[in-house]
Each structure stands twice: as C-alpha cells, then as structure tokens.
Amino acid sequence: MFFLFSKFKLKKWNKLSYEKRFKCFVAVEKKVAKEFNISPIKLELNYDENWNCYGAFSVSSGKKRILLNSRLIEDPRLRFHALETISHETRHAYQFSVVNKDLRWFEFTAKKWKRNWQGYFAASGDSLMYNNQSIERDAQKNSIKFLKRYRWKYRNEKDFKETFDAVFGRYDTADDKARQRYGIFYKWKIERNIRKKSRENN
C-alpha cells in the first residue's frame, strides 16, 4: 500500500499491464472505502465507447458496484481522473449506506441526501442541477480533498495538474452558474427542485 500511489507516476504507469492497473484501482478503492468505514465496492469496467462519463455507482438487487470507463485504464493521461472517480463514486457508496438506515430527527445532512437520492438529477440531463445537488457537491468536495493529499507527490506530473484543475474548476464554477440562473436564493431553489422531483418519484 505504501508504494501504491507511486505507481501512478507516468514512468511507472506506462510499464504496467491493464491487469495491474486495474489491481491498482481496486487497491485505491479499498483504501477509500476503509476511510469511510464501509465495505469495499466491486469495480467493473465499461467498454462502451459511447459512454460519456468516467464512472458511476449503482445498486441492483442489493449488489453494489462502481462502473469505470475502460478509457481510465487504456489512456495513461486519465490515470488521475481514475483516482478522482474512484474516490467520488466510493463517496456515493458511503452516502448510500448513510441514508439507508433509520435516521434520527437531527440528522439533517443525511435526510437531505436521502431526498436527493429519491430526486436525483442525472448528468445526462440538467448539468447545472446535477453539479449543484447535495450528494454531488459532497462527492466532488471529498474527491478534491482526496487529490489534494497527493499534490506534492505528483508535483512534476503534468496530467495531475490538468486533472486537479479540471475537477476543482467544475466544483468552483458550479455556484456561479447556479446563481446566474436562480439568483441569490439559488441554493433554496435547487433544493426545492430536488424536493419536487423526490415527491414525484415516490
């Protein structure tokens, strides 16, 4: 585990087979899951060339999985996007574990997440709502925090800087875009949209 993140440096990454790269992904997921005090989530690769996102967390018949775009393994330039995606989707797994239990009256964040799960806005739809809904903001914030740990380690890795700037930029501009659309009460209006969709889905 100590040398795990050193393997993501380009010179070492280029020498790894796809199988070994995937094992690195699995090890990263286990580390993140342990930090969130949840069981590791099974990783699977999606080879659909038309799939336009890097990853997704899903639950089907009680089985949890994180689906990763195969390009994260195939394209060395995307290896740090893989780190961000694994951290992001494992955070969703944590959120799911939090909301699927009896919530006490004062667990306001968990209740907000639960409404959001019930009234979720997919990335393929309204991108502004997607990026500003509470479970996505939380997952984005946590993945940024995760990447920040390794800024010094990867200070000479061009791909890391580009990945971090893209991830942080998306998070940082989401507020501005929401404010432009909804005005100063944008957070309340976004939550109102989620509540409405949650009611419609239940």
Name what the model sees in each region.
Residues 1-16:
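A short, surface-exposed helix-loop junction/capping segment
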Residues 12, 34-41, 100-102, 150-158:
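Surface-exposed helix-capping loop/turn segments at secondary-structure junctions
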Residues 80, 96-131:
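Post-HEXXH active-site segment of zinc metalloproteases
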Residues 18-39:
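Zn2+-dependent metallopeptidase catalytic core
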Residues 80, 121-202:
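Long, well-structured alpha-helical subdomains associated
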Residues 17, 21-25, 83, 131, ...:
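Hydrophobic (often cysteine-bearing) scaffold residues that line and stabilize catalytic clefts
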Residues 37, 44-67, 76-78:
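Catalytic zinc-binding patch centered on the HExxH motif and its immediate surroundings
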Residues 84-97, 139:
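Active-site recognition of the HExxH zinc-binding catalytic motif
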